[in-house]
Amino acid sequence: MNRRTFTKRTLLASSAFALPKFSIAKPGETKKINVAVVGVGGMGGYAVNEAANENLVAMCDVDDSRAANAFKKYPDVARFKDFRVMLDKMGKDIDAVSISTPDHTHFAAAMAAMERGKHVFVQKPLAHNIWQVRTLRKAAEHYKVITQMGNQGHTFPGMRRIKEWIDAGVVGDVREVITWTNRPNPPWFVPPSSFPPVSGAVPNTLDWDLWQGPVKHQDYSSDYVPVKWRGWWNYGCGSLGDIGCHTFDAPFWALGLGSPISVEVDRKEPPGKGFIPMGSVVTYKFPARGKKPPVTLKWYEKGYEVPKPKRWQKDKDLPSGGGMYMEGEKETLYHSGMRPNSPMITPGKRFMEMKSKLVKIPKLPSVGNGPIQEWYRAIKGDGPMPGSNFDYSAPLTEMVLLGAIAQRTGKNIEWDSKEMKIKGMPELDSLIKEPTNNGWEYGENLW
């Protein structure tokens, strides 16, 4: 590929960097955003601190214990347990809503905010089922709001280097991608001592009904909260939902993977107890995209041996914590960890040989200070549309959720993206669009 062709492709890839249409201020105008945060413990604490650099006007959490640090740090900020009440009472005072709740309430919180014209940030995965992620994408356009999903790695310089190297033809055609994680592991994924788990008294700091929200209500158990919900299909999306939006991000973006046509699974134990497998291998098949060849992407969880790249240092193990590599016709592109902190060409000796060539490749625009700040800049009109806006993050999350369906059922599936159906398995329709409790329905008007 010559420089002119690469520059043209880079400009096309950079089209997402145009200023958004729905900002609240003119470029350069000094304005602080009125931000409400839903879910202020855990990752929500990070969201609260980011919001405090703007105008933190409201905090919402169903658990006073989990929220205690944020409530203590910002005692004068309005507090709520129900985000619907918060939006009804303070809607006129809120510009944007940052959501860091468990997976099963992402959709309802985001839709309630967008219906009122609020810009939204949602932690990964974007939602709990495929109908929800597609509806969120529709809603972002319908309500003309600026959106962002919290996969931090999408803002990293390493993410841009991967995209640049792929577009420049350094790696060559890629037909195989290998990804892996050391999860499921404690404290997030801990099988209960019995199924169903032992119930107990609801802590007086927790509104258990509100915590469950849109899904079928069950007796309280400490095997669900505060962090173990990730392992239960009613509430979480397993290791894939936890890490997939991070580790799939680079190949999904750089290779333009789009929607898979099939997903296969090998799991350690049979399905049926409502809890995730404690290890699996998921294989995605993607069709050719224009001149790009078909791609097989494999996801390895804890307990499965990950194959080493063809081009790798002898006697060196892959890092156990996680990583990703793409096998190209020319080179192997690799990064360790769940996110692309320091991508490289392997083996290391080859990377050193290529460095002088790689530094000459034109650079994509950088993103500073993480995904929430990127979202704030777009809202203010001081920066482009966020890179993980719902047009991008909804299809990425859909890929993750298809793998979760295969894990959950133990079935290999063929996916009809256009019809939003798993071929020949109508019994799985209820996992594509899950039942919702009365009073928690959103988005039906967008279909």
Language model feature labels by segment:
Residues 1-14:
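N-terminal secretory signal peptides and thylakoid transit peptides that target proteins
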Residues 12-74, 153-156, 166, 251:
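N-terminal Rossmann-like dinucleotide-binding module
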Residues 31-33, 54-57, 75-76, 92-96, ...:
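Loop/turn elements at helix/coil->beta-strand transitions in domains of secreted/extracellular proteins
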Residues 37, 99, 122, 128, ...:
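Hydrophobic residues in well-ordered beta-strands that form the structural core
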Residues 63, 100-105, 126-128, 133, ...:
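Short, solvent-exposed turn/loop segments enriched in Gly/Ser/Thr/Pro and often Arg
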Residues 77-135:
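Beta-loop-alpha module in the N-terminal Rossmann-like domain of NAD(P)-dependent dehydrogenases
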Residues 119, 127-205:
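A contiguous active-site-proximal alpha/beta segment in oxidoreductase catalytic domains
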Residues 161, 173, 178-184, 188-391, ...:
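Contiguous beta-strand/loop segments that form the cofactor/metal-binding neighborhood of enzyme cores
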